[in-house]
Amino acid sequence: MSRLATVQRTTTETDIEIRLNLDQPEFEAPATGHGFLDHMLDALARHSRLGLSVRASGDLHIEPHHLIEDAGITLGQALTQALGDRRGIERYGSAFVPMDETLAHVVVDLSGRAHLAFEPETLDVWGQAGGMTHYHLREFLRGLCNHGGVTMHVRLLAGREAHHVIEAIVKALARALRDAVALTSDQLPSTKGSL
């Protein structure tokens, strides 16, 4: 079974192509035109050990929101395509990741049902990282959840500095996804018989 996907998303605001391979960790350096988003996508690929290629352009002269959100949407679509009927996947993943003073916890369920609980939006996270805030990250994750059929809970246990908060969350997501997409049986991981 091949767990590959290529998704192209073009709007008046962005043009994004994502290639995803759930079983081969070969990836290309992301090229979105937004340095910090590239850094986070690189971290996502490396720590999830998934093959990921992201080529994108967008209306960065306005603000990075559209590009970041649409990258999440496109990644969610690629994840849905690559997972197929989700037969045999572990389904759940959870990871804690520290980054200096920051500690993030991310839990995912690849149930096919979309939900994002994003605790950092209720906290006082300071500043931005390369023009990206934790609110931008929330929109990326919301797009991923809505279009990838992912239930995700994001908790921030310590830390307030935006760069460390965003990076710890992305790395925790990567490690949780790595576990959740793993093939561990030939059954659908559901008492309903479908996901």
From Swiss-Prot:
NADP found in the keyword field: no
Catalytic reaction list: D-erythro-1-(imidazol-4-yl)glycerol 3-phosphate = 3-(imidazol-4-yl)-2-oxopropyl phosphate + H2O
Enzyme class per UniProt: lyase
Enzyme Commission number(s) of this protein: 4.2.1.19
Chief place of localization: cytoplasm
Recorded superkingdom: Bacteria
Alphabetical list of Pfam families matching this protein: IGPD
PANTHER family: IMIDAZOLEGLYCEROL-PHOSPHATE DEHYDRATASE (PTHR23133:SF2), IMIDAZOLEGLYCEROL-PHOSPHATE DEHYDRATASE HIS7 (PTHR23133)
Full protein name: Imidazoleglycerol-phosphate dehydratase
Involved pathway(s): Amino-acid biosynthesis; L-histidine biosynthesis; L-histidine from 5-phospho-alpha-D-ribose 1-diphosphate: step 6/9
Organism per entry: Deinococcus deserti (strain DSM 17065 / CIP 109153 / LMG 22923 / VCD115)
Family: Belongs to the imidazoleglycerol-phosphate dehydratase family.
One GO molecular-function entry: imidazoleglycerol-phosphate dehydratase activity
Family matches, as InterPro entries: IGPD_sf, ImidazoleglycerolP_deHydtase, ImidazoleglycerP_deHydtase_CS, Ribosomal_Su5_D2-typ_SF
Any coiled-coil regions, as ranges: none
GO cellular component terms, semicolon-separated: cytoplasm
